[in-house]
Structure formats: C-alpha cells, structure tokens
Amino acid sequence: MPGNHHPDDVSSVLRELVAAGRFQEALARHRAIGDPVLRQRAEVQLLAATAATRLGELSLAVSLAEGALDRFRSRGDRDGRMRAVNLLGAIAFEHGKLDIAERCFGEALLLAHDLDDNLMEARASNNLASLAVLRGRPEAALSLYRSALLAYSKLGDRRGTTEAYHNLGITFRLMKEWQDSQDAAAQAIRHAELVGERSLLALAVMGRAEIELERGDRDLARQELERASALAQEAGDAVGSAEVQRLTAVLAIAQGDYPTGLRLAQEARAVAERFGGVLLRAECHAAAARALRGLGRTVEAEQHRAEAARLFESLGAVRWLEELRREWS
C-alpha cells in the first residue's frame, strides 16, 4: 500500500477487510504501509490489532493495541480508548491473564455506558460473561450473555449475535441443559451462515460438535468436526484448526483410539503454545493425559495431568479443574 494514501482511505480499507473476515489480508495491508506515521495512526493500529487477534497472533496484537491506546489517550479520544481496552481485555483473556482482562472489560463497559454506546456495552457484557463461565458462575454468565444477545439483536449485529448464541450454547452445555444448548448452537450456526465468515462459522459448528460429543452422538460430532476443520483451514485460522484437533482428539480417545488421540492433542498443544492460548493448552494437556493413561503410560499421563491442573488453577477455571479431579480420583 503506497505511503501517499489518505489516512481515512487506509482506515476504510482495513475496516472493510476486518468486517469481511479477511484478517490475513488486513494484516498484510498494514505491514505494507510505507509511511511509518500512517502505519502508527491509532485507528490503523487498532484495526490491525483486531486482525492479529482474530488470527491468534496475540503478541503482535498486544503491541498494536497498546500503541493505539496510548495515542487515543493522548488526544482524549474516549471512544477509541474504549475500543482499545476492550480488545486488550480479549487478548489478556486468551493469554490467561484474567485479572487484567476483567479490569479492561470493566473499563470498556463504563466508557460504553458514559458514551451511550450500546454495541460496546454488549461486547463488554459478552466478555465479562465469558470470565464468569471460566470461574464457575454459569448463572451470572447467562444473564450477561442474554443482555448482550438482546443488544446485538436490536442493533442488527449478526457477528455479535452469533458469538452470544455460541457462548450461550457453551454455558448450557456446561450445565447439562442439552436442549437449550442445542437450540443456541443451531441459532449460532444460522447467524454465522448469514455473516458468511468462515472462521466464525467454524467456531459455531465446533460448538455444536462439542455438545454432541458430550451427549454421546459421536457420528454427528465427527461430521460437524470435519465441517469445522474444513472451514477453519479455508479461513487460515490456525487456532480454530487447533481447537478442532483437540476435540477430534477427545473423540478418538472416547472411541479407544489412544494413539490418534495423543497425536492430535500434542499437535493442537503445539499451536496453543505458539499463539499463547492458555485454556487451549490446558485442555490439550488434559486430553493427552487421558490418551497416555489409556496407553498404559502412567508416568507421562500424570505429568500431563499435573500440567493441565496447574494451568486450569492459574486461570481460575473452576469447572475444568473439578472435572479433571473427578476423572483422576
């Protein structure tokens, strides 16, 4: 992208690419900006940070989002500051830094309320709900997710609606409310299909696969995992592909195919370590521990179990830690 483009033109191009789910192209466009002043404009940096976050390049995303936040603060731009801290909260969540994430989401929610920004209020509520799920407070999460869903629906934001339904599906699944979880997952897929973004659709399909896996419908779970894998690969979504691998590992282990389960869990963990996803890393260690125990490799199994427990504990992931302890008691 030549350096003599007008800043607003550059922002518009990046915004369109991000909105279309073309995150790799957006990041490539940002890297190609010749003018360093233009490349470091707050809005341009924040859009590039959003693309990097969606691609799982979290270290780059932090650097870009923090740069944008500094510039927004220096010029007293509360709207920009709100969007930047919300994104930094999402990145901190993926890195397992939940106290930082909660602080960022709380700040974003307060700013959104002051600015009467209903969309950001919905996003911040959605993000705070995800923290509540992780910390074992599903009832609190349901209330926040429903508030976010209502706001997204009123605003006509299909991406947000997809994410809220997907998260409701997860929460109902954790509560063993199968019909509600299936209904929410179906709605997530319907809205994701209307958005037309492959990585978002992969996420929604994966949500349904995990529900069916826990319900015991392994054939349907496999079909949905195959679909999610193809979508994530088409989107160039490495982290999404790793999530599919982890679930496919869980399926293989449930069917007694421990070698395949171990291989897939280890491959997914390598991706999680590269991109800094702590929860995914912990879940991969837990899956590897189950596979190794099935193979009779008890010493290695215990090592992976202990590492999974350590990571779950560091996250405050109450439900995940309790489930692991039940399995190994």
Where are these regions (language model features)?
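Short coil/turn linkers that connect adjacent helices within long alpha-helical scaffolds
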Residues: 34-37, 73-77, 94, 111-117, ...
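C-terminal non-catalytic interaction modules
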Residues: 1-13, 263, 267-270, 274-329
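Conserved alpha-helical positions within TPR/SEL1-like repeat arrays
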Residues: 18-19, 46-54, 79-94, 119-134, ...
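Eukaryotic tandem repeat interaction scaffolds
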Residues: 177-277
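Flexible inter-repeat linkers and adjacent short helices
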Residues: 1-85, 109, 314-329
